[in-house]
Amino acid sequence: MKAQKGFTLIELMIVVAIIGILAAIAIPQYQNYVARSEGASALASVNPLKTTVEEALSRGWSVKSGTGTEDATKKEVPLGVAADANKLGTIALKPDPADGTADITLTFTMGGAGPKNKGKIITLTRTAADGLWKCTSDQDEQFIPKGCSR
């Protein structure tokens, strides 16, 4: 009798079934991981801008959106980042703060994100009354970056 060489059809079918089960579990988990990292990237794009706003307010200056140089005659500091600096979305500043009497909002709208975050917004708001920053997001609860709330 000849010795068997290779795999039988049933063995190959079992391997294919195992790979299918692993893929069914791994792909959704990877998509969730990508969605969480998009939120973290958006927050990381906006968070450092708080320093620019605080510095301008401490000097009694205003902050304008976009890039450029300080204008001492207008007492104006650029935000220091282009609106489209992150490929995941856009950054906006409202209102342009001058004397700290109005609440300041930095928003990141995720226009270039994946399907789970498309159009979602991360907002950093500085209240004029106490000068504290608060991060909120309209993302699904599981994708909101640490330090933000719904």
UniProtKB/Swiss-Prot annotation:
Cellular compartments annotated: Fimbrium; Membrane
Question: Per the annotation, which location comes first and is thus the protein's main one?
Answer: other
One family from Pfam that matches here is N_methyl
Which SUPFAM superfamilies does the record associate with it?
Pili subunits
Q: Where is the chain membrane-spanning?
A: 7-27
Q: What is the similarity comment for this entry?
A: Belongs to the N-Me-Phe pilin family.
Q: Name one GO cellular component term.
A: type IV pilus
Q: Does the keyword Methyltransferase apply?
A: no
Give the membrane topology: Single-pass membrane protein
Name of the molecule in the record:
Fimbrial protein
Report disulfide bridges, numbered on this chain. Answer: 135-148
List modified residues, type N-methylphenylalanine: 7
Keywords linked to the UniProt accession: Disulfide bond, Fimbrium, Membrane, Methylation, Transmembrane, Transmembrane helix
Q: Which PROSITE patterns match?
A: PROKAR_NTER_METHYL
Name the propeptide positions: 1-6
| One example of a Gene Ontology biological process annotation | cell adhesion
Please verify whether the record's keywords include Cell membrane: no
Q: Assembly and interactions?
A: The pili are polar flexible filaments of about 5.4 nanometers diameter and 2.5 micrometers average length; they consist of only a single polypeptide chain arranged in a helical configuration of five subunits per turn in the assembled pilus.
Q: Coiled-coil annotation: which residues?
A: none
